[in-house]
Every structure is written in C-alpha cells, then in structure tokens.
Amino acid sequence: HGWAVRPTLRLALFSGVFSLTGSQETSMTDQPTIAIAQINPTVGDIAANVELIRAARAQAQDLGCDLVMTGELAVSGYPPEDLVLKKSFQDAVKKAVLGLAKLTSDGGPGLLISAPWVDDAHLYNAALLLDGGKIKAVVPKCVLPNYGVFDEKRLFTPGDQPGAVNFRGIKLGIMTCEDMWGADVAQTLMKDGAEVLLVLNGSPFELDKSHMRIDLARERAHETGLPLVYANQVGGQDELVFDGGSFVINESGDLKVQFPVFESRVEAVSFGWDNDILAPKPGLMVDALDENEAIYKALVLGLRDYVNKNYFPGVMIGLSGGVDSAITAAVAVDALGADRVHCVMMPSPYTSKESLEDAAEAAKLLGVKLDTIAIQPAMEAFEGLLREQFVQHPADTTEENIQARSRGLILMAMSNKFGYMVVSTGNKSEMSVGYATLYGDMCGGYNVLKDVYKTRVYQLCAWRNANHTDGLMGPTGMAVPER
C-alpha cells in the first residue's frame, strides 16, 4: 500500500479511551478501505467467534482493506448476560483478544472488535482497536441500555465520554450501539477531531427498526458533518434475532452502502477525500425486504440458530391439520431441512377428517416424516384414573385439556427418546388471551410464532406459498395447504 512508517510510543488515558501503543504505526493511503464483518457469533463460544473474526480478516486482507470492524461483543457473543461476571470467562475473552491482536502484527488490516473488558476492577462493554500486534485503544460503551431485553447497567460500568482514536493517520470516532442514539457522544468525538464515526452494534430485529437506525445515523451525520459506518451482528440468540443490515452514510446523510439482512457478509467500503472530508464511495446496495418476507426470514434464522447453537439434531412438531402447526413446520423445514423435522399427528375421537387430510398434505408438501399416534387410549386411561375423584362433577374443559396434555406428554416422551427439540405452535393472539393449555400445547423448547399474531400467520402462509428465496431449505412452490 506504500504506507509511511513513523515510530510511536505512548501510554495515555484520555476522555474515556485507554490508548496503549508501543509499536511502529503505519499510515493509510489516500483511499482508505474499511471492511464491515457482519458475522453471526454465539454467546459463550469464544473459539468459534474468534475463528469468524479471523476468517473475516483474512477475507478483508485479500481485498486490501486497512481495517475490519465487527458488531458489538463479537468475541463473547451478544447478549452474554451473567456469563460476563465469571472470572474464568473474562480471562478467556482477554486471552482471545490478545491472540487477535497478535494476528495484526503481519502488517495487514487492523481490527476493531468488541468484547467484555476488565480494567481497574471495572467491567466494560468495550470496543478494542488492534493493530501492529498490540491493543492500540480500548473504548468503553458510554450509554448502557436498561429496557426491554437489555439490562446492561446491571453488568457493565459505563465509560466516560470518549475521544477520537488515531489509526494509521485517520482519527476514528468509535461508538457502541446505544452511544449513537443520542447526540452527546458523537458531538464529543467530532469536537476531538474525529474524521469518521464507526458504530459497533448488537441491535435486534423489530419491524421498521432498520429505518429507525438509518434515521438516527443521519441525525448524527448532520450534527457532526461526519460519515458514519454502522456494523450490526446477524443471527439468533435465544429469543432474539439480529438482522444485520449494516450500512454506511456520508456526511450529508446519503446512504452509500446497504448490507443484506439475515445473512452473514464481509464487504469492503472504500473512502476518498473530498475537501478534507472523508467520503465513502458507493458500494453494495441491497433493497429492503417487505414486512412478510422480513418476518418469515427472522423466524427461519431464529429457529435455525437456536437449534444449531444448542446442538439439537432436529425438531419435533405436533401437526394438527391447522394453519399454525402447518406454517411452523414450513419454517422448520426452511430452517433445517426436511430430514431434521419430525411431525406427529395425534388425533382424538373428535378430530375431523379434514384435519387428518390437511396434516397429511402439509407433511407431503414439505417432505417430512409424519407419524400418527391416536390419543384415545391415553384419554381413557387418564379419565379412568380420575373417575373416582370426578364422580360428582360433570365433564367440562378439564376433560378437553386432557386431550392437549396427552399430546404434550407424547411429544415430550419422543423428544426424550430421540433428542429432538419440541417446537410448540401457539401464536401471539392465543397467548395474549390465555387460549392455550399449560403442559399441553404449550409444551416445547421453542415457539416460532410466539410474537406473531393470527392475522400475520395467514399473511406469512400466503407469502411462503408464493415465494422461495435464497437461504430457505424447503421446497419451492406451495408449502402450506390451502383449503
């Protein structure tokens, strides 16, 4: 790259940034290039996460990039919750970060990563700049979210307002996720001479969230006159789904790069100088998904990662002949493939002929194994066990719920025997009004539709029957029977 070399030796703590350098520092060219590593880390699997970062850096090195940036807490996985309070975990994270720092001694791209970081007995959610074989700077997150699914104030110490960090001749304004949501941190970085804002994120998927992120980034760009690079993680972690959708805007708020959602991607972003302003060049631009496609792909990714990251061989679903279990099975096949989805139809004496036909048709369309286990013997056994206790009480919902609980018992027994995780099928409309049976149709380790209203269920069925896109492992064409 024809970089100039100048010796540096400094150890300083300024404005919430720990700067630790003691090696020769290279300068970026007039056309600096930053690679965004939109990767899918796993909470607690430090070795696998480090390998993802290594692979992203190798790819960026082939592209001639100067710096690689990841999402929030990419080393530990996000959100790590109480795992970060264990000293053994903190030590393992530190060892991993030092190993990644050593990787940068080859003169290739620097790394801007994120990890739980202990300093002076304080635990920070920190961005770390690695270059020349060293940790060049540690930038703690200032604004810790404490609402909804976030409880970072319980775990981390907030950092002070940060200063800009010099990287190969360019002053970086480094922020982590919530730091960007208000004006203060970006303004402080601008006043300290930052020439570009780099934001590392662990921002989960919600409808219209991508527009909110871009709008906030535009506000920061307009306020500071600086370009902004937004790197978000992708993947499922327990009940959360991270959609990625990383992007770059220029100092005027114009969108110059837009990553895809729900898929891992490493892409180089090139910059040039325009009247002393670092200007991102137009790059990858991916169109936004419509609502139903976005929701469907979020469901697929969430289930896929929950199953794979917890090492389940597959899933088991009670197929009733209804729309909820049919779309759940379709999502499961699109996430895992038909060979990892085992469906069970469990008819009672009251199950309609149409339900039996629809369950069989759903299994046929998806190519999944379907067992049929009649629950009448279980119902009669339970009713016989309880007959003496119920003798003076007329039949009511108790007997109806025995049907659901018999099915739950069968599914959980098969799960125990074969190791497949049971996926429950109730939707958000049912859950919100209590239309479900405890220890019956609520049995399961994961519920695909827990945040999907019934009206949306029908929309997702229509979308899936009309569409098949990259990343879906199920069949093309109709996936949910229509009646």
Regions found by a protein language model. Give the residues of each.
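Short acidic (Asp/Glu) and glycine-rich catalytic loops that position anionic groups and cofactors
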Residues: V199-L200, I277-P282, G337-H342, A359, ...
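Enzyme catalytic cores with a strong preference for nitrogen-chemistry domains
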Residues: L20-G318, A329-A338, M345, L370
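Acidic/polar loop patches that form or flank catalytic/metal-binding clefts of enzymes
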Residues: Y230, K256, V422-S424, Y458-Q459, ...
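A conserved beta-strand->alpha-helix junction
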Residues: E263-S270, R340-M345, K353-T398, A404, ...
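Active-site adenylate/phosphate-handling loop in enzymes that bind or generate adenylated species
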Residues: K141-P145, F150-P162, G169, K191, ...
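Extended, hydrophobic alpha-helical segments in both membrane/secreted and soluble proteins
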Residues: I53, A298, G302-L370, A378-F382, ...
